């Protein structure tokens, strides 16, 4: 069936009722555009912010002034990079839903190393909230974690050279979720 002939899209949840509405998809929507729309709507739902602005650009992933910016998705939404992108979106959406910036600023240590550990542990805490309850979110977060650790070089570092903040976050994540570190990251804790 062509667009408008049985194909549907999903709208963000209604803040008043928490419901999702359905509307016809645009005729020319590509799989990448469908993926972007689904990813943005999932981030809004996870963040519990129906009006959350989600942008795609080369400067993502980041959260700034209430705007979630994500990297452009791969052309093939089934590509392994898609799980990483979903994890990046979930990570930031969970931060919006479960992080108190004022409290964090008040409690954050002044010492740089202590502040890095504090920030990493706080991010592990907010991610654990979603990972404990939602298997898909847990899988996405694991994919994003492994990609982030690989890009930072932490997976290739000897145990004594792993950044203390990364190791602390992995330990807190394990404690809060009951899930061992992903296979690629276990050597960081040896």
Question: What is the meaning of each model-derived region?
Answer:
Residues 1-6, 17-18:
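Glycine-biased, low-complexity coil/linker segments
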Residues 8-10:
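Compositionally biased, low-complexity segments
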Residues 20-190:
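Basic/hydrophobic alpha-helical interface regions
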